Every structure is written in structure tokens, then in C-alpha cells.
């Protein structure tokens, strides 16, 4: 059996595969439906990982089962995939290897860790998949989930070569991580962006929660999310 650490080390210099149709086909329709219902997708310029970790901490306190997928890691790849219990990710490598062979593609590091985390979540029948987006949202690898629950932490001028030069362009890129949003949590943003969210996204969002808390106090933001979801 291939060791997950060795598998990932071989991916370090491989360019990521952004063909979302390919990546989506890694999952069955049933699996995608489960992911859509049970995933908390987190997008934003700053505060994504800390928000994800705070939500995970709150879930663990109530004995809820979860996997939190975040990036990047500081010391060890396992930091990207934390769960309420110890998991052996080695047993899921075969899924990736078969997928790459079948489609004649090489997955990048980010794609590999994301797909493994999602597969482990599905196979362990967990309550929540907390999923931090990589860059942007609309064309991000994690958008294959089409989550019904999306969290927007903050908006700033990042990756403008990919996401656009205007704050409004970046906002649209990030929120459109899913076209299937039913519940949207938004941390403090400027008035213009709040008005855009209220006017443009109420058509497909059943509930929009605007937090009064700054992202620097995102434990409070995370508590708001946690309260509404439970």
C-alpha cells in the first residue's frame, strides 16, 4: 500500500489540475449530494483556517464527527486534515491512484489532499465536512462540492491576476464557490459589499447571516455559525 506522505511528496512540483469536471467525477452523484448537504465551505481573503479550526473545536465539544480541510500547512501535511478522531489516510490512496490512471492525469498537491479528505469524510459517515477553499471560489477545486452552507470571512485584494482587480470581482469569485447556497454567513465587510450581497445573493440564499464581529475576533463569528447550524 502506498504511503500517503510519500505520495504527497511526489506531488510537490506537479501543477494542479483545474479541470473541475474531472475532479467532480471522482465522486458518485450520491457522494456529491452528501457533500453538498454536510459541507461548510469557507471562503475569504483572511481568517479561513482559524474560522475552520474554531468551528471544529466547537463541534468536538459536542461530540460531533467532522473532518476539517485547511491549507497550507506549516510543518506536516496532516495539519490540512484534522478530525474528531485519528484516521489512517493511507487506505484512501488507492482511490487517487486509480482515478489518475483512469483519466490519464496527475493530480496536484492541493487536489490530492482535498479529495482524500473528502473521501475519508464520506467513508466514515461523519456529521460535517469543514472545507477551506484554496484560491477564490468559483474555479477553486473545492467548488465541486457545491455546498449549501458557505462562510465568507473577509474580502481583500489578493490573487488579483486570477480573481480580478476590483473588490467586487473578488467578492463574486469567492461567494460563487457554490451555486447551491441556502445559508450564507458573512463576517464584517464594508457597506458597499454588504449591499451587493443583500441585493444579488438573496435570490438563491434562503438565509444570510451578517456578523457584527470583526474577523480578528473570529471565535465570535464561529460561534454565530455554530449556533445557527445546530
Where are these regions (language model features)?
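Acidic, Mg2+-coordinating active-site environments of NTP-dependent enzymes
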Residues: 124-132, 147-230
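Short, hydrophobic alpha-helix immediately C-terminal to the catalytic nucleophile
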Residues: 53-57, 115, 223
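Class I S-adenosyl-L-methionine
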Residues: 9, 60, 97-100, 198-203
Amino acid at each position: 500500500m502506498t504511503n500517503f506522505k510519500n505520495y504527497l511528496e511526489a506531488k510537490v512540483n506537479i501543477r494542479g489540475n483545474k479541470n473541475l469536471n474531472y475532479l467532480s467525477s471522482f465522486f458518485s452523484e450520491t457522494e456529491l449530494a452528501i457533500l453538498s448537504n454536510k459541507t461548510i465551505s469557507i471562503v475569504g481573503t483572511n481568517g479561513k483556517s482559524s474560522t475552520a479550526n474554531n468551528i471544529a473545536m466547537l463541534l468536538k465539544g459536542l461530540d460531533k464527527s467532522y473532518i476539517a480541510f485547511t491549507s497550507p500547512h506549516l510543518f506536516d501535511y496532516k495539519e490540512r486534515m484534522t478530525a474528531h478522531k485519528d484516521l489512517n489516510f493511507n487506505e484512501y490512496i488507492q482511490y487517487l491512484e486509480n482515478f489518475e490512471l483512469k483519466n490519464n492525469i496527475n493530480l496536484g498537491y492541493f487536489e490530492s489532499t482535498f479529495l482524500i479528505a473528502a473521501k475519508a469524510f464520506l467513508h466514515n459517515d461523519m456529521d460535517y465536512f469543514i472545507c477551506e477553499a484554496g484560491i477564490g471560489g468559483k474555479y477553486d477545486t473545492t467548488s465541486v462540492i457545491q455546498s449549501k452552507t458557505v462562510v465568507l470571512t473577509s474580502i481583500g485584494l489578493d490573487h488579483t491576476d486570477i480573481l480580478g482587480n476590483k473588490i467586487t470581482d473578488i467578492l463574486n469569485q469567492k461567494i460563487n464557490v457554490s451555486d447551491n447556497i441556502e445559508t450564507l454567513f458573512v463576517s464584517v465587510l464594508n457597506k458597499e459589499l454588504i449591499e451587493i450581497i443583500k441585493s444579488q445573493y438573496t435570490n438563491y440564499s434562503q438565509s444570510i447571516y451578517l456578523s457584527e464581529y470583526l474577523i480578528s475576533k473570529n471565535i465570535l463569528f464561529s460561534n454565530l455559525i455554530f449556533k445557527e447550524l445546530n
